[in-house]
Amino acid sequence: MIIYLHGFDSNSPGNHEKVLQLQFIDPDVRLVSYSTRHPKHDMQHLLKEVDKMLQLNVDERPLICGVGLGGYWAERIGFLCDIRQVVFNPNLFPYENMEGKIDRPEEYADIATKCVTNFREKNRDRCLVILSRHDEALDSQRSAQALHPFYEIVWDEEQTHKFKNISPHLQRIKAFKTLG
């Protein structure tokens, strides 16, 4: 089972395309939708939905995957639910760059301070990070600096922030999922 978390643009047709691409790894791909506008509510909702899926799951090696803001959530929810994560261009600093787009961006900073201390150290090697060199929305070098001490970083030379085509990375994701 692969759980897919969309980014800030929840209505993007690219979400459906990514789900279809992920089905080449595992036919059981589940999209979990969330508001993107209310961080604390989103965290509760995502934890509840992912936990429910895991309770009914038969896959011994489930995976959670997210793009952009979905990558922010996939890393945290995956850690809290003890499943491996794959994140594409994760938005690591939404409290800085979501101002004016969501109701309370400061809630992201609050969530970060309430999360498990040094959670990335405790999550070491359980997250695969795929970053675009042509991310027009986020500073991928800053993301790499924050994540490289803990996770493997894969660089993509073609895609932009929304990562429309993930197919060149499917074999790597499949191998990472298999490690479970």
Curated annotation (Swiss-Prot):
Pfam families in the cross-refs: UPF0227 (PF05728)
One of the record's GO molecular function terms: hydrolase activity, acting on ester bonds
UniProt source species: Salmonella typhimurium (strain LT2 / SGSC1412 / ATCC 700720)
Family indicated by similarity: Belongs to the UPF0227 family.
Annotated Gene3D superfamilies: alpha/beta hydrolase (3.40.50.1820)
Record's GO cellular component terms: cytosol
Protein name: UPF0227 protein YcfP
InterPro entries: AB_hydrolase_fold, UPF0227, UPF0227/Esterase_YqiA
Gene that produces this protein: ycfP
